[in-house]
């Protein structure tokens, strides 16, 4: 599934992501835009360390999910393939786990590059939140 920006914003708001970990809803949606283009089936790799990135939030197989290609910390306790379906509830749960680590949203390189310290005040202005 490819979400629209506003569709994803409403979904994430319903899952209490606005303010989660100290990050505004706009930060979460911005991160998803630049990580996956809002596509739940986004799959990328092979990364330099042999890992792959899965789904809407491009969650990494070395740290967050298990893909049977290599050993994993599997901190979200989930098979990576589950992060490629249209149900994003488990993706959201895993993203919440990621942001609890000291790096916070800086775990996502695309967020650092495109969203961090940017003025996102108008980013969701059209979404009727």
From Swiss-Prot:
Cofactor needs: Ca(2+)
Gene3D superfamilies (UniProt xref): 1.10.530.10
Active site, UniProt feature: 35, 53
Its job: Lysozymes have primarily a bacteriolytic function; those in tissues and body fluids are associated with the monocyte-macrophage system and enhance the activity of immunoagents.
Record keywords: Antimicrobial, Bacteriolytic enzyme, Calcium, Disulfide bond, Glycosidase, Hydrolase, Metal-binding, Milk protein
Domain C-type lysozyme: 1-129
Pfam family, one: Lys
MF-aspect GO terms: lysozyme activity; metal ion binding
EC number(s) on file: 3.2.1.17
Extra information: Lysozyme C is capable of both hydrolysis and transglycosylation; it also shows a slight esterase activity. It acts rapidly on both peptide-substituted and unsubstituted peptidoglycan, and slowly on chitin oligosaccharides.
Protein name stated in the entry: Lysozyme C
CDD domains recorded: LYZ_C
Organism per entry: Equus asinus (Donkey)
Taxonomic path: Eukaryota, Metazoa, Chordata, Craniata, Vertebrata
């Amino acid at each position: 599934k490819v979400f629209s920006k506003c569709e994803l914003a409403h979904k994430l708001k319903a899952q209490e992501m606005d303010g989660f970990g100290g990050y505004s809803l706009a930060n979460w949606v911005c991160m998803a835009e630049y990580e996956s283009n809002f596509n739940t089936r986004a799959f990328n790799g092979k990364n330099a360390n042999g890992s792959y990135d899965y789904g809407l939030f491009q969650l990494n197989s070395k740290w967050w999910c298990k893909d049977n290609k290599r050993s994993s910390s599997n901190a979200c306790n989930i098979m990576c393939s589950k992060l490629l379906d249209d149900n994003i509830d488990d993706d959201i749960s895993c993203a919440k786990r990621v942001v609890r680590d000291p790096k916070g949203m800086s775990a996502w390189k695309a967020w650092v590059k495109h969203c961090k310290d940017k003025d996102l005040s108008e980013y969701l202005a059209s979404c009727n939140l």
